[in-house]
Amino acid sequence: MGSIAILGVPGAESGGGTLKVYNWGEYIDEDVITQFEDETGISVVYDVFETNEEMYPVVEAGGVKYDVVCPSDYMIQRMIDNNMLAELDYDNIPNAKQIGDDYWNMSKDFDPKNQYAVPYCWGTVGILYNKQMLEQLGVPKPTSWANLWDPKLSDEILMQNSIRDAFMIALKQKGYSLNTSNPEELAEARDMLIQQKPLVQAYVIDQVRDKMINGEAAEGVIYSGEMLYIQEQIEELGLDYDLEYVVPEEGTTLWIDCWVVPKNAENKEAAEKWINFLCRPDIAKKNFDYITYSTPNTGAYELSDEELQNNEALFPDMDSPAMKNSEILRYLGDDTDNIYNEMWKEVKAQ
């Protein structure tokens, strides 16, 4: 668990009590927390986590009773299934109307009646490629995940060190659902990942961005929200190559992180004020500028400049074939999780 930061204003507690927030690291502009405290008189206790898997048992155990938490799609589904979340009162969250219909519909995949979760950030997984390096290697611009099996890319590929992301790539290439629990389809995907392994320079997470900026690889699997930072760095450093992002035609993982209120929250009223505050367009825009992951907030989108609005990595055409073929990650249950884990070990052991 991340260290607790109590960001309060003197005497604030008497105004509205304390709000315990559990969020991803680097996933909010800290000025927003201060502004919330100043405007509401509520004192914020703010903890951070690194993965959904780290967050879940902490909330489940209830040692710290968090009032508001920001999990991802599949983990929200798991929390709903296990009766861990409180239904939201949207009368207290009028700014929820700023969230676009596309994102409410995406959320229905794991929260069918939109009762428990308010979208915060979203994005895709795709291929980041160095245009000039691909030309030198004689590799075409990627339009399919199959590109990551091109023998000319030996030692030039950075893969995500993430079980579901890695399997998604192999499964989608074969035309299977990224949420399959079919052992035969999973075995096929495992074998493909083993076959690809000699081409892979490294399995990494956060390092894809910096390695690609440094020209250390020709292609990398990356999250769409990294593109704004990458484009700024290319300009700032005056690099003489282009890094471009594409979602392959077979589709990809659509992910969405949302705010939820655990059932054992001690200050649900403050939690709903927090969610409402973060849905305010000026605040959502401030967070978007800081986090750089796509915002589902239509008001914040309208406040953004035209260049950002037209950035296809951040705001893709939802009617394109690639996006229509994309899926939200689902929680598949412990048994299927174990199959994925065992098969991933087999890939890494080769």
Give residue ranges: language-model regions.
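Early extracytoplasmic/lumenal segment of secretory-pathway proteins
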Residues: 6, 11-79
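Hinge/lid segment of periplasmic solute-binding proteins
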Residues: 56-57, 77-122, 137-146
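Short beta-strand->loop
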Residues: 86-97, 117, 237-253, 262-265
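A bilobed periplasmic-binding-protein/Venus flytrap-type ligand-binding module shared by bacterial periplasmic
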Residues: 128-133, 172-175, 255-267, 286-287
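Short loop->beta-strand "edge-of-pocket" segments that line small-molecule binding or catalytic clefts
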Residues: 146-161
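Ligand-binding pocket segment of bilobal, Venus flytrap-like solute-binding proteins
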Residues: 158-162, 166, 170, 177-246
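Conserved C-terminal helix/tail region of periplasmic/extracytoplasmic solute-binding proteins
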Residues: 210, 320-350
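Mature extracytoplasmic/periplasmic domains
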Residues: 262-323
